[in-house]
Amino acid sequence: MEAGVGLALQSRAAGFGGSDRRRSALYGGEGRARIGSLRVAEPAVAKAAVWARGSKPVAPLRAKKSSGGHETLHNSVDEALLLKRKSEEVLFYLNGRCIYLVGMMGSGKSTVGKIMSEVLGYSFFDSDKLVEQAVGMPSVAQIFKVHSEAFFRDNESSVLRDLSSMKRLVVATGGGAVIRPVNWKYMKKGLSVWLDVPLDALARRIAKVGTASRPLLDQPSGDPYTMAFSKLSMLAEQRGDAYANADVRVSLEEIASKQGHDDVSKLTPTDIAIESFHKIENFVIEHTVDNPVGDSQADSRAQRIQTL
């Protein structure tokens, strides 16, 4: 068994007001903590330490080129306004609950997650990055190489456990986080959103940027697209049922079809974020029929939306 010692905060913040926002602190590479009261955790699991509101504030989003097949973040002012409106509607229903984005590698979870977190006023975390910082290694690929996939998965579960005790977060999970039932236990404390991207689009994105940072796809030789598509197809078959456990499925093919596109690469991350908010709102409304909000709250929300 891989040996390792993790540290975790004994107390974690659970709700964060706008007046007491504080930056998070994460463990350094040599098992040193920068803040907080610490305890030694069980062997072989290096735990992410998270305090207060989460990660560093996300920088303002601007239209720009993207290496993932998306040309811009916002196509127009109208799109940005729609994003803001949908986020305000969803915020009412979320009541501080976290959002966990799941999906295959290259599906845009981090890009879309940053957009969603900024407009919601939430903090954003990439679970892979938290594992890297907790273990003290620069990449997931190196963790796989030096330790093992199982070692990485143990730490990934520990990170998700720590995050699940918090509120007002958007979390981009690793592509394989869904394969462990315990991770669903943690993610079900919030709302899970599956970004469902066609395999062809995923393979094109990954072939374009390379596979060195993706240990499950990295191959010594062969056509990048063909190799990526073959491996992604195998992973999709293994994980398909697990992804379907998500509360919400956001199909990029469906979004593209509604917009009259024949290629999902024509969608912007903002398109995907807007659809995600729409699906989240529908899901929460459907699942709160037996526990509706009070009349005064509903009236207040209706008046607020009408003024937008």
UniProtKB/Swiss-Prot annotation:
GO BP terms: amino acid biosynthetic process; aromatic amino acid family biosynthetic process; chorismate biosynthetic process; shikimate metabolic process
Places the protein is found: Plastid, Chloroplast
Induction comment from the UniProt entry of this chain: By chitin oligosaccharide elicitor.
Annotated residues for binding of Mg(2+): S110
Pathway linked to the protein: Metabolic intermediate biosynthesis; chorismate biosynthesis; chorismate from D-erythrose 4-phosphate and phosphoenolpyruvate: step 5/7
Record CDD domains: SK
GO molecular function (one): shikimate kinase activity
PROSITE patterns reported for this sequence: SHIKIMATE_KINASE (PS01128)
Broad class of enzyme this protein falls into: transferase
Residues at which substrate binds: D128, R153, G175
Gene3D superfamilies: P-loop containing nucleotide triphosphate hydrolases
Pfam families the UniProt entry points to: SKI (PF01202)
Hydrolase found in the keyword field: no
Family the UniProt entry places it in: Belongs to the shikimate kinase family.
Task of the protein: Catalyzes the specific phosphorylation of the 3-hydroxyl group of shikimic acid using ATP as a cosubstrate.
UniProt-recorded name of the protein: Shikimate kinase 1, chloroplastic
